[in-house]
Amino acid sequence: MLSRPRFRPHFHVEIVPGEGVVLLSDTRHSLLRGRLYELMVPWLDGRTADDVCARLRAEVSPAEVYYALTQLERKDYLCEEEPALAAGQAALWSSQQVAPRTAVRRLAERPVVVRAFGVEAGPFRGLLESLHVRLADEGPPDVVLTDGALRGELEACNAAALRDGRPWLLVKPAGRQVWVGPLFRPGKTGCWECLAQRLRANFPVAAYLQGRNGHAGAVVQDRAATPATLQVGWGLAANAVASWVVRGELPELEGKLQTLDLPTWRLQTHALIRLPFCPACGAGGSRGFQPPALAHRKKTYTSDGGHRVVRPEETLARNGHHVSPITGAVPLLERADPDGDGVLHVYVAGRNSARPFRTLGQLRSDLRTMNSGKGATDTQARASALCEGLERYSGIFRGDEPRRPARQAELGGAAVPLNDCLLFSERQYRERETLNARASRFSFIPVPFDPRAEIEWSPVWSLTRGEVRYLPTAFCYFDYPQSEERTYCIACSNGCAAGNTLEEAIVQGFLELVERDGVALWWYNRVRRPGVDLDSFGEPYLEHLRAFLQAHGREFWALDLTTDLGIPVFASITRRTDGLPEQIMPGFGAHL
């Protein structure tokens, strides 16, 4: 039993005569019924339990008092009389189920080192001192303040923390968005390099300027700052640091980044993913290659023309943490058609990273090209866009891909001749400069392949031969670094897909190739294909779609582009009917 019991400091305690006692805080309230509690309240101010009994002896027995004290302590309404501490601070720790005297002791025992890069640290240190956090000037940093999370100094902080196995907290108090976190914990969470990889991808303009113009530090984007906004950032971070010291952990920020958008007061949590092959905290080197072990998977969702092992709702639930404008593999997932009237459902999922850029003009064009997804329902469209975003992210070259330098002859029959995949003609190669000058980047014709050149090759698995083959790494991954004079190929997203399982992804990627094959045979040969009797399907959604398009001055129809493969391939085409130009727009699909 507590020797000097008193109500926890965060409670407002008030007697309601004849009814009981109310305990009130900003997060909870309790009612203590009975005259005994009304009698005890005035004396629960840090006196000893024996003194409380003595004060009430004329009205109630000591046994009743001790029993009531035991019940109040069991329900966590009481704490021990505390040493001198500001009432507000005592209440704060008490509301977190931490005895104020315990908080004071832990704050005094554990020193905190603060480092700052590009921002002032003095006001932040002052806030920590006001919270009784013990500060130290020497030693590795526990907290790092910065005006940009890609500053070069942070790489050294990260390396030292990984070497020592020491956690540290990143804070960005400047800018429209205040960042508190992540709390990096070596061996458990991702590290700063894991964060930096995602930041470079999600802030491509800053990353481009840093690489193009040779900035020694990060390109500082977060210039918005006033004494008031900085105080918000410092205050949030100071409370987090004090809580970390007292509790010994900070699960709210461990492997997580909290942002506060000051104009809107929107608070968001962003998950930091630990990258398995991170060069700083992961396995490093090449991720190796193993032939895929395919297995039978039960299809549980076959609506909307797909074959999936789970419903789209579950796909979103499993992978939603990958969506973040800061730490996400997919920076956003937003509806593209707010006036879809419940019929058209289209989402965008960030920029299309399948197109490499080398100039500012190409970057500008790249930023306007988005990943997207569609569906007959809102959920299907969101899942579709998310999977396309993850697909494109997964195909980006990062340096840990399995590959080996070799000349084609050194690989023998295992090498797939590059032009068997590219299929460019001799005329196209001869006239490539002229054709490239007037064509889009999607129609880029590379330098003719030199089989004597030593390049990097990556292993792939042949499903038809059941053996390992090799393709140029540049053909397999987006953004593979190569000089212009040795650009024999670039990666293409045709046949790429993401799925809930490996088998599901393979099926979806294969169907995309079947679709493109059917379209190419139809388009380039200019052959006539039969129309599709859409009414024969008896599908209500098609009726709703037709009515929606008619209301917007458009019509649509479908062509059957199925080839000798026997897998249905359709072209869905829509055009304006209320004037010129017709704005003809086709869409294609293949499904089993």
For each of these PLM feature ranges, what is it?
Residues 1-5, 10, 14, 20-25, ...:
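Helix-coil modules at protein/domain termini and other flexible surface or pore-lining loops
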Residues 16, 136-139, 171, 194, ...:
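Conserved beta-strand termini and adjacent loop/short-helix elements that scaffold enzyme active sites
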Residues 17-19, 25-135, 158-159, 170, ...:
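Long, charge-rich, low-complexity alpha-helical segments
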Residues 127, 141-235, 243-249, 261-293:
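E1/E1-like adenylate-forming module used to activate ubiquitin-like modifiers
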Residues 133, 166, 554:
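Short glycine/serine/threonine/alanine-rich loop segments
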